[in-house]
Amino acid sequence: MAAPAPAARAAPEIITVSTRAEYVSGGDVLVEVRTHDRGAARHLRIEVDGRDVLSSFREMPDGSRLGLLTGLSVGSHTIVARANGSGKGSPPGRTARLDVVNHPITGPLFSGPQQHPFFCETAQAGLGPPTDAACSAPTQISYRYRTTSGSFQPLADPTVRPADLAQTTTIDGRTVDYIVRLERGTIDRAIYEIAALDDSLSPPSPFTAEPGWNERLVYTFGGGCNVGYHQGTGTGGVLNDLFLSRGYAVASASLNVYETNCSEVISAEAALMVKEHFIETYGAARYTIGWGGSGGAIQQHLIANNYPGILDGIVPAASFQDSLTLGTVPDCRLLALYFASPAGIAAGWTAEQRAAASGYGTFNSCNLWHLAFASRTNALEACPNAIPVSARYHPVTNPTGIRCTSFEQIATQLGRNPANGFAWRPLDNIGVEYGLTALQSGAITAEQFVSLNENAGGFDVIGQVIPERVAADPIGVQRSYQTGRLNTGGLGLASTPIIDARTYTDFAPPFGGDIHTRFHSFVVRQRLRDANGTAANQVIFIANSSGSGAMQIEALTRMEAWLAAIHADDAPGSAAERVIRNRPANLSDACWTSPTT
């Protein structure tokens, strides 16, 4: 009787490590190939589009193969891994295939058609003039060191050890010279920065972690909210002692600053591409923590909800839930202009009554919205200096120019009104009874209530105040929900650890008020409850100015513990269940009133 044929080996597994297979960028991708036994690994063949690339792979301690594939042209490529039989009588090999799609390093991946014109700022950022129309510039590597007196200073020669060089001990117990490698360049038309401890003389490698890197990444986001059409010069900041001293690498890009780009879709894309480049340079990060305040918090909330996997945990500060439901911004403009008008003055409003009608603890907060951000709903008011006057919209002299409103940044998602070219707006105050709660409580008179609502007005398509109320474009409302511009909290945010770390500024000097009012933290909490039945994945920290530093340290420390527990949990359950059951038992809402308590 003939011997039975040997059983076929299980097929290898091909995994893109640096990004999702459909979102490869820049012509390279870090790939892992796993086999089910080391015998198969010794007889492995790996190809890209029929080309043998096995030499690009290294065997890792767990028996898998890790390789950085380079030179991919734009478009689709097929990776094939074949575990061949090891000799006569051995089981036949099995083949695995994975298609990857490579995109230009200048983008886009998923954000849609890029804005044009787009004004480059590489020279202003110190990278030299752009090398193409997509605002590219050569990558720069420089070094900084931390002094014993607590500042970062340039280090022209990384082989030199200055007399005032500090050392630092990372969270995994390694003590290293506090030298930082700073990489700056361009990705997705943004200027990016990556900082990490690096006291070695060899370049970083995705195959071996740097001695000072703790294999974690913090991704920072900057605040504001304005129209795009330009590159920007600053990032969310990467030279941060809080992170670097503990061994975290830090990354960010200029399109992760909301004042440069008030679109979390573009921000998410830039973050994904920068993170891909980071992993291909340093290796896979165990997890990535989002960090940043105000508009930076909006980006974290929306990216975590709509693009899960880019950020594993988030630490929003001065937080807001999203930008489109900040209806108080245009409302505060209407109220401020009314109170300063003859009708408002004649109605005799006191400071207390203005606050009561606005719903804020002080009307100063509402007035700050009017002064600082309400212009972002007006196509004529808020153009950044990077956009030349000749390129800006004017209804008569340049009707096809750049409309400098925040709605313009999400026009790809909202669509445009073909009659006038403006993005469909969800802006609406039809039926709003300003000051109703104040009237019901007796804080204002009926005459004041009527005067306010008769004279509040609304906005025309340009964003200028008019006597009539404004009705939302139904298409704009529908698409705001459909495309995730309104943060329900029911998607990826439900399975994201959140530590909301707020410095209390509701009545802060010098204005006696602030736009970053505390209740927005609880708006996020309620949305999580409404969408998921629980908000156990969110913790709220709050501090006064003297306790803010201690609060930030605690937020990072607690987020690290939370993510480490999730990372180690391989028990059954959904992602949301793993987040909640691994929340540290002693982690709860807390406040700080001093650097120590």
Enumerate the predicted regions with their spans.
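Sec-dependent, cleavable N-terminal signal peptides
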Residues: 1-8
